[in-house]
Every structure is written in structure tokens, then in C-alpha cells.
Amino acid sequence: MCGIVGAIRAHHNVVDFLTDGLKRLEYRGYDSSGIAVNTDGKIKRVRRVGRVQLMEDAAREKGISGGIGIGHTRWATHGGVTEPNAHPHISGGMIAVVHNGIIENFESERKRLEGLGYRFESQTDTEVIAHSINHEYAQNGGRLFEAVQEAVKRFHGAYAIAVIAQDKPDELVVARMGCPLLVALGDDETFIASDVSAVIAFTRRVAYLEDGDIALLASDGIKRLTDKNGLPAERKVKVSELSLASLELGLYSHFMQKEIHEQPRAIADTAEVFLDGGFIPENFGKDAKSVFESIRSVKILACGTSYYAALTAKYWLESIAKIPSDVEIASEYRYRSVIADSDQLVITISQSGETLDTMEALKYAKSLGHRHSLSICNVMESALPRESSLVLYTRAGAEIGVASTKAFTTQLVALFGLAVTLAKVRGLVSEEDEARYTEELRQLPGSVQHALNLEPQIAAWAQQFAKKTSALFLGRGIHYPIALEGALKLKEITYIHAEAYPAGELKHGPLALVDENMPVVVIAPNDSLLDKVKANMQEVGARGGELFVFADLDSNFNATEGVHVIRAPRHVGKLSPVVHTIPVQLLAYHTALARGTDVDKPRNLAKSVTVE
């Protein structure tokens, strides 16, 4: 949520970078944007509610230019969606600040600063930061780095901050605690951003800041950096693997459409570690073998779509590896009394690796005595891998659409690989079993491509869904989490109310909702629960409900009045949930198209949830 950019450029106008960078961060979610630039010794600011383009147009009209500046896309947390609440915030014409995160003690800090004579023009917690730094700056004789050092000592909460001063045209100071922030190095120019997508068009050399870091930047790089203990530190500069092409639409109309169709390649790339090297613990880290041999159970913590991936993994972990597994929503886990088990593996799942609730849940688990942790995420050098003892990166590539697609299916691949690896370590996988699992994984991208070929039929269904106000999704066993994911996708981007239930729970309440106006989507592959699912479908049909069935070629379903059937490719084995994810993604996408909603930037939602 929110996006930060900033730059010091020795030979170029920063406005070009600031506006381009903010546009590349639009996918994170926002409601307003702004930039502040030091122009001839004065800080000039432009802010607008709405799209970044509106703000950029205003900046061009005002002729703003300069060699140092900061920018921000805001997602409202404190105060409404208004221009005065948009960032950057300026204190006394001297200090300009952009901020991602939440300052939990901002009310007491605001009262303190008001007592010192500072006037507030907004309802935000960020203005507290600007005035606090300005106060310290005045007290210490104009040393910006030290002013930020002193000010952040007073803040409780999570933040990523970038600061410029009117009389320091060659200094940009940044600080990080709990929210992502990176420094990128070019030729006589230095950039900062919330994620690498904002800078990749300008440089690929990136250093990721860690919690507690404060850095002083100039056009020729990092001049000073201290860690959480206030000690001098260095951060390794790496070359980003992200390609600029992955951030462009190409021939597609929307990023979600592009990312749905990229899944065969993303799945193949993620599976490669298991197909080339086998299901070995070393795929997860050098200490994984001893950890996997010692654990007695698994706890998975995640939010949103990643939580549904975790629910799917529970079936694999218990059926393949025979290891007791528990799944919890991270935002619930971190606030309850937990019975800790030092021999339990804590797994966290996050596309960004920066989801705040998941990060804090992991820290909580470790504080209780959990010794072993594994993160599965899509972003190199993000917070969760750094906090975890083991890690496996998915290879989904950049995911721009707010509604997750390829990140979800690659998480499933990684979790399946984990289940087989644990089973192998525990002596539960024969050579024949491993060969079978390997072949299932090898064939998966092809099966997913066959499912994508069903798009015209699914698009036709979407025309009917577009007229509805509610929908019900049903699944059984390992396909129940896919029903949950389908309902989430539909509500996220079409704004149609959708719920998902285990099909066996119909008679315990949801059946009361069924009538001729309620479409009921059923995930119905040919597995051991198929007859049970058919019985549940009869219950829906008897109440006049209209059934939309995603079956497979062996399910023996026929379309009749009130029953629509699309047959996905039959994928024998444990990975059927991955294949059946594709149709529910396409259904949501084409229904959103038919309803005319903003597919890639649905209302009220953000891609990276870095606040509570």
C-alpha cells in the first residue's frame, strides 16, 4: 500500500523519474499522489486526488524541475481522500516528507508538536513526521541525517520515510522500519523506491534497506548508513533480475489477463528446481535437511489468496508427508494466545514478502520459541526471507494486477514440492512415487495451457454472471480452497458478492440462498468425492438454482437445462487444484470485463498490504 519514489540526479530533471516511477507503483493501490522537488532553493510541491496522470499534468503546467525530489502514491489510512492529506507533507517550507506505514502514537506526537507551536494542515500521521524532523533540524543547526535519527526515535509503528530539505539540494535521507524501501544506483544519480519496478527503467543495481536503517544519499550513492543499533553498516548492491518487459502490457489489454496467460511459463520456472535437482531439502536452504528431520508438525501463516494456497497445502502435507499441519490467517494468529512448539515448522506465504500481518505473525511465533521458519514468496530480498531460516522463491515474475493469479499457482507448485520433499525426508516416498510426482509436475504447464484454451467458453458464461448480484462457489476436499479462491477473485474485481463453501455444508445454511437468481459454481473433477459432489448438485437443482460446473473429461457430466458444464483437462494425481484454478480466474476476469470494472485496480484494494 502506498508507493514511495525519490531521486538525486546530477545531470537530469528528477520529475521524469518521479512520475514514471509512481506510474509503475500504481498497481500497489492508491487514491492520490504528489511530488516535491527542490527548485532553485525552494521546495515546490504538486498533489492531486485521483490518477498519477492528473498530478503529472499539473506538474508539467507549473514547470517544476530540479535535481532532487520525492514522490508518493497514497492509500488513505489516517484522514480522508483529500488533497491536503496527500503526500508530500511540508513543514515550515523547509522539510518535505513522504511516508509509507502507520505511526501508531501520532496523536500524542501531534499534541506535543502543537504545544511547540507547529500548525497542522492535514489529518494524517505523516505530517507529524515532517514537523518532528523540522524541529530536530532547527535544534541541531541543520544536520538532516541527525535530525531524522532523532525524530524516528519517537515513532512507534511501521514506516518507510524519505526526506529532503530546502537548503540541502544535495542530500536525500531515508529511513526504514517494517515497510519496504530500496536504494538504486545509477551513473551520477541515486534513486529510492518502495519496490524495484519503479527504478528498473533507469538502473538494475539495487541495495535493499533493512529494518532500522537510516541512509544519507547523494547523486554518487550512499554516503552514510546506520543500522538499527545506530552503528555504521553497508548493504550489498545486487543486480535485479526483473525485466522491463515484464512490467509492460505487450499485446494484452490488462495485466491480469497477461498474468493469467503467463502461468504455464511461471509454473514451469517454479517447478524447475524440483525437476532439475529433485525433491531435496537443499532446495530450501543449506540447513533444511536437519530442520525437516527434526520437525513434528507444520503451521502455515498467510493472508488473502496466500491463505487459500496454504489451505490447499494442508491436504498435500498430511496426505503425502503424513505430517500434522495447521493453517491460520496471520492477522488472527498474531493477536491470540498460542501454544508454541519448538519442533514445529512455521511457514509464511506472501507474494511480496512484505505483508505486514504475515511478517508480524512470524516475529510473534519466533518470540514464543519457534525455532524453524520457512518463507515462500515471489520477491527476492524482501522482509520475510530475511526473517526466515529457510526460503523458497516462486518464479512468477512481476505481478502487477491487484488480483493475484500466477503468484497463487506458483505458490501451489512450491508447496507441493515441499510436501513431497518432507515425505522423502521422512522415508515415505519410494522411487516409483518420486517418479510419478516428478511427471505430474512436468506435465502441469501443459495441462494449464489446455485450461487456458477454454477461455472462449468461459467468456460466454461471464455474460450471464455480469447480470448477477451474488454467486455461490462449491468444492470438496482439496478443491474447496479453489472454490474459495474463485469466490475471492469474483468479488475482488467484479464487485459481485460471492461466497464459497464445502459442498457438504450446503444443507447447513447456504442452501437457503439458492434460487433461480443465484448462480452456483461447482468445482467437480473426477476424484473420490465426485459422487458426493453430484448429490450436492442435485440439492441445488431441486431448489431452482442454476449450476455452472467446472468438471474434467472423465467426470461424465452433461449439460442440461439449468446445468452448464465446461470440461477442464484431466490432470491425474495431486495437482488437479492448480489446473482448476485457471477457469475460476478466467470467469472473474471476463465477468469484470462485461461489467466494465477496473480489472487491474479494483476499488478499495491494494496489491501490497504493508499496514495492519
From Swiss-Prot:
Enzyme class per UniProt: transferase
Superkingdom of the source species: Bacteria
InterPro entries per the UniProt record, alphabetical: GATase_2_dom (IPR017932), GFAT (IPR005855), GFAT_N (IPR047084), GlmS/AgaS_SIS (IPR035466), GlmS/FrlB_SIS (IPR035490), Ntn_hydrolases_N (IPR029055), SIS_dom (IPR001347), SIS_dom_sf (IPR046348)
Disulfide bridge map: none
Active site: C2 (nucleophile), K607 (for fru-6p isomerization activity)
Span of domain SIS: 288-428, 461-602
SUPFAM superfamilies: N-terminal nucleophile aminohydrolases (Ntn hydrolases), SIS domain
A GO BP entry: UDP-N-acetylglucosamine metabolic process
Keyword Cytoplasm: yes
Chief location category: cytoplasm
Gene Ontology CC: cytosol
Record-level Gene Ontology MF annotations: carbohydrate derivative binding; glutamine-fructose-6-phosphate transaminase (isomerizing) activity
Subunit composition and interactions: Homodimer.
Alphabetized HAMAP family for the sequence: GlmS
PANTHER family xref list: GLUCOSAMINE--FRUCTOSE-6-PHOSPHATE AMINOTRANSFERASE, ISOMERIZING, GLUTAMINE--FRUCTOSE-6-PHOSPHATE TRANSAMINASE (ISOMERIZING)
Functional summary from the UniProt entry: Catalyzes the first step in hexosamine metabolism, converting fructose-6P into glucosamine-6P using glutamine as a nitrogen source.
NCBIfam families xrefs: glmS (TIGR01135), PRK00331.1 (NF001484)
Name of this chain's protein: Glutamine--fructose-6-phosphate aminotransferase [isomerizing]
Organism: Neisseria meningitidis serogroup B (strain ATCC BAA-335 / MC58)
